[in-house]
Regions:
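Protein kinase catalytic-loop region centered on the HRD/HxD motif
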Residues: 131-145
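Activation-segment/catalytic-loop signature of the eukaryotic protein kinase fold
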Residues: 86
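Protein kinase glycine-rich loop
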Residues: 17-25, 29
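Conserved N-lobe loop of protein kinases adjacent to the ATP-binding glycine-rich P-loop
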Residues: 33-42
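C-terminal lobe helix-coil module of Hanks-type protein kinase domains
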Residues: 191-267
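AlphaC helix of the eukaryotic protein kinase fold
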Residues: 48-74
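Activation segment signature within eukaryotic-like protein kinase domains
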Residues: 127-128
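Conserved short submotifs of the Hanks-type protein kinase catalytic core
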Residues: 90-104, 108, 112
């Protein structure tokens, strides 16, 4: 288990750790103060690579991380946090991006459920439109960029109402000929993962992977009910309850859009 950074630690003479704000299997995310730009806070993502990898593969993974961090740094879209820096210290790699204040959509959904309410459809559709803008931008890059871990907790709403798609930990760049290159290894979250994403890095994924997760995320937000896992639906197609059977206030148009996005057979 990697030793965590401590509050007050300064990396690269610039980024002073404030506190940990997220943790995963490959590292942690910290809130940090940028000592060169007074008042600016940033999110510092620390990546600890699998030390059991052969030396050549480990080196390749690290070079790949830094190379593709450069790709992320070129992205400029209102619903994506800006990546501003990347570097390595010892065996760890770091990605610096905008810190996004506000609550994530999972928090808002759980609050509504505790109050025996559903999130208003018009609000969720507004968020969905912003998410669609972000995904269209990513998928239209050359080569296309996938997020691969779209879910309510990775969508943050700023105090001004701007939606941000956060956690680029599973971003994948699609190289020409559909050869896939993974920035940071990961397989997404089962509730929002389509069939084709199972199987790790050997699995076939393309932009439809994000579309499925988009639909599954909307399903969860609008019904306050976790969507059935794709593998279970494959064995039992009736396993997924239509959204309007849970939330009768939903429009038929929205239900159809969700079920279309969550189609098990994207072709």
């Amino acid at each position: 288990m990697p030793v965590p950074l401590n509050p007050g630690d300064v990396l690269r003479g610039r980024y002073q750790i404030s506190r940990i704000i997220g943790q995963g299997g490959m590292g942690s995310i910290y809130l940090a103060d940028d000592l060169r730009l007074e008042g600016r806070q940033c999110a510092l993502k620390e990546v600890e690579h699998d030390r059991s990898l052969p030396a050549d593969l480990l080196q390749e993974a690290r070079e790949q991380f830094l190379r593709e961090a450069t790709v992320l740094a070129r992205l400029d879209q209102p619903n994506l946090p800006k990546v501003s820096d990347s570097f390595s210290i010892g065996s760890r790699d770091y990605l610096i991006m905008d810190f996004v204040p506000g609550k994530d959509l999972r928090e808002l959904m759980l609050k509504a459920r505790q109050e025996n309410n559903f999130l208003p459809e018009d609000e969720v559709i507004n968020w969905a439109n912003q998410l669609a803008d972000a995904l269209t931008y990513l998928h239209n890059q050359e080569p296309s960029i996938l997020h691969r871990d779209i879910k309510p907790s990775n969508l943050k709403l700023t105090p001004s109402g701007l939606l941000k798609l956060v956690d680029f930990g599973l971003v994948k760049v699609l190289a020409p000929g559909e050869v896939t290159i993974t920035i940071l290894q990961g397989q997404g979250t089962a509730l929002y993962t389509p069939l084709e994403q199972y199987g790790g890095d050997s699995a076939h994924t393309d932009v439809r992977t994000d579309i499925y997760a988009f639909g599954a995320t909307l399903y969860h937000l609008l019904t306050s009910t976790p969507p059935s896992v794709a593998r279970e639906r494959f064995l039992d197609p009736e396993n997924l309850t239509p959204p309007r059977q849970i939330n009768s206030n939903l429009s038929l148009r929205t239900e159809r859009a969700i079920l279309w996005a969550m189609n098990l057979h994207p072709d």
